Amino acid sequence: MKKNTENTNAFLIHISAFAGFIFPFGNIITPLIAWQTLKDRSHFLDEQGKEVVNFNISYTLYVFLLTLTFIPFAIGSIFRKNHDFWNSNHFNFDFGFDNIFGFIGLVSITSIVYLTGIALVIIASLKAKEGENYKYPFTIKFIK
């Protein structure tokens, strides 16, 4: 295969992770299908496909664990202010400063994680377009 076509295909495998914004788990399914389709054409495409799929599985796992970490705090902060809910028949939505700062912290951490994921996919796509073998940071090797 020509090097230019190989680089373009590697670029497309990396950029296909943005399908996760269109449908659930698209960031895993789309690169997996692209990698399975193109992996026999060259060693470079095989390596980059594995790298993309491993990163997106790891990234999805990290986001899931982050969500699980914050759910108890979110539920606890809502019900802490509403401990007398069963006696008063109204729900108090006055969160106060502690909950506002908690919400701002949650939004900040979530934004950083999502923007980091987007930036890493863009960087990897551009490196693959140049023919470089890019390795994502913090990636668990599910597929070896």
Predicted regions and their residues:
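Repeat-unit-sized solenoid/scaffold elements
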Residues: 94-111, 131-144
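Hydrophobic alpha-helical transmembrane segments in multi-pass membrane proteins
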Residues: 11-28, 54-84, 98-121
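Extracytoplasmic/periplasmic ligand-binding sensor domains
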Residues: 88-93
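Membrane-interface extramembranous regions at the lipid-water interface
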Residues: 1-57, 123-144
